[in-house]
Amino acid sequence: MRVATWNVNSVKKRLPRLLVWLDERRPDVVCLQETKLADAAFEQLLGAELAARGYACALHGDGQWNGVAILSRVGLDDVVVGLPGAPGFPEPEARAVSASCDGVRVHSVYVPNGREPGSEHYRYKLAWLAALRENLRADTREALVCGDMNIAPTDDDVFDPAAYVGQTHVTPAERAALAELQDQGLHDVVREHWPAQRVFTYWDYRAGMFHRDLGMRIDLVLASGSLAERVRAAWVDRQARKGQGPSDHAPVICDLDEAPDGDIGPVVPPPSAPLLKRGVATTPQGAPRS
């Protein structure tokens, strides 16, 4: 089973790229974030195209902001929209949806950005992560937690740690919250598969960050123990970040039981630009802002 997660940064803006990508990569399950469409609008825009490709959809959107979805062609059962017990800002936001796909509990999550350390948004982010952790703790089913975590797990997951000092996505409290989430028996499949390689999933649109490979790894697939053992390939589809009108995130792909493209990765295709030496080019254009 091929599972992918992708922050598309607006489904409407990503058409027809999304459909072309589905046809090329043929994932069985897709977790989308930042769909930025109400459910009815999503169905009107994509329902027929997805049905023709064999996908059923679990949607949780609220229009202009946020929005998550699960697309599955291997079953879509026991759908839960939202995150029980999660705080709102001030109302609950469309940041989580889960479903069972071919016997696997799949969660598509879009963790709040946090904006500025110590701010109200930052406290909301930490509280939301705590609610996610408690939901996973209470559910003993084997699970894949997929999505935009808006946290780089370690300094190895940013192009230059010194450039992000004082910003969100890298603070000790955020990383501790992510570690506590993983303490529920979840494995970061890309990092476990590629422990020493330079791997990013997000590059700011500005200042040629993508072409210079100045990014962050904030989009993760976290797998519970027995599922992690089934992983045959785990990689970032950098090709989807190229060309005209891309999302600022690349999809992350995880193959269970068999790998149709072989054990490729960690980034496909690899960056062509020379690697940046840490501490040389600082002043990033910043972590994601929404």
Where in the sequence are the language-model features?
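Active-site environment of divalent metal-dependent phosphoester hydrolases
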Residues: K13, L37-A40, P117, A152-P153, ...
